[in-house]
Amino acid sequence: LVYLKSSDFLIGLLNNSGAWASILAIFSSFIYERMKKRKKFLITLNVTARMLICSIVFLPLISGNHAFILSAVSIMVILGNLLWGFYGIGSTVWMMSLVTKEARNEYINIRTLFLRISFTLTSFLMGIVLDLFNKSYTGFLVIFTTSLVFSITDAIILSKVEEPENKIAVGGTFSLSGAAEPLCNAKYRSFLIFTFFYYLSLTMSSSYTSLYLIKYVKLDYSFISVVNVIANVTMVACTRLWSRVERKKGLWFVLRVSAIVVVLEFFIYSFLTERTYLILLFAPIFAGVGNGGFNIAILSYRYDLMPESNRTAYEGWYGALYGLSTLMAPALGSLLMRILPEINNIIYQYSRFQLLYLISFGVSMAVILIMFYRPQKRINVYVNNEDA
């Protein structure tokens, strides 16, 4: 999108569309809970979504009309991510149904470890590819084509995975009361409220990060790839560490500590300029350490709150609130940047971006403190339930 010279707001919006597209997940239970077997439907969603997103790179070969290309890219990315968000709900429930509750956390840790290793290698290699082609269209063509091949391979492998039969409601119907059940669960409702405000506060600035690094701080793709590799390597290194901490201190401890470490990345970004670009090497360390524990713990935590039945509705509400927050976030970030003052001194070069990161840090810290550092009596509710 930066290559196509899109507007800052469109870049921020589409850059985050993979997250906010999950809003439609709220309707997923009406389909998934009527299906005993979901694999063929999920694979169809998988392939269609990836084909739409990966194929945007071929648009300049079809037309030279810049307005048409931008419109087509926007439609294909949004539609592809909407389908992917719908797929994500079903695939996550499928994945979690393959393991017992006792083995769940260990399975999530091992799976995440391998995912992070693959992400690290891929992001590093693709950054090198872009720089080898001098950030030209050919470089993007190679990357997106490679991604398309990997996506098709992934679908073929997925077709070989065993699928347990899903227990559907008597008569094959699924009611509105079943879809609304997560909102009646007080603990899960509290978790949903946290999810909304936590991701809203972070995404209102993070949705503009790639734009800020490339267009304003003027970093090359190799350096950005190094930053991503540092984050992913740190996550890989800390995955097993957080797993040991969880066994000793509990899931709640991991959540409340790792959440704080995550948002420290945004504090560092608030001081990032062309002059201070080297501090960017510290930001992924906090991101890697924090997300190394938080992303796994938040998945385990929400599945601990869910009953064994009707998980699609619970996962759907999580996806919907997460998606809604990330849809609103770029607009909120854009609004704040129009209001924030232009300052130019030794600390601030692009003050509107930098102050936005600082606001993200402050608001997200407040959300974390309210959720995880409330009076001891409230915290013990979850701890006691774990022991039970």
How does the language model describe each region?
Residues 40-44, 143, 250-257, 356:
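Juxtamembrane helix-start motifs in multi-pass secondary transporters
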Residues 163-193, 216, 381-388:
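Juxtamembrane intracellular "pre-TM" segments in multi-pass secondary transporters
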Residues 24, 56-61, 150-162, 353-388:
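Multi-pass alpha-helical transporter architecture, strongest
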Residues 253-295:
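C-terminal transmembrane helical hairpin of 12-TM major facilitator-type secondary transporters
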Residues 14-29, 42-49, 72, 76-137, ...:
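Substrate-agnostic recognition of the 12-TM MFS/MFS-like secondary transporter fold
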Residues 1-10, 207-224, 341:
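Short amphipathic helix-loop junctions that connect adjacent transmembrane helices
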Residues 46-67, 131, 260-275:
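C-terminal ends and interior cores of transmembrane alpha-helices
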Residues 3-4, 34-35, 94-98, 212, ...:
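Helix-to-coil boundary motifs at intracellular loop junctions of multi-pass secondary transporters
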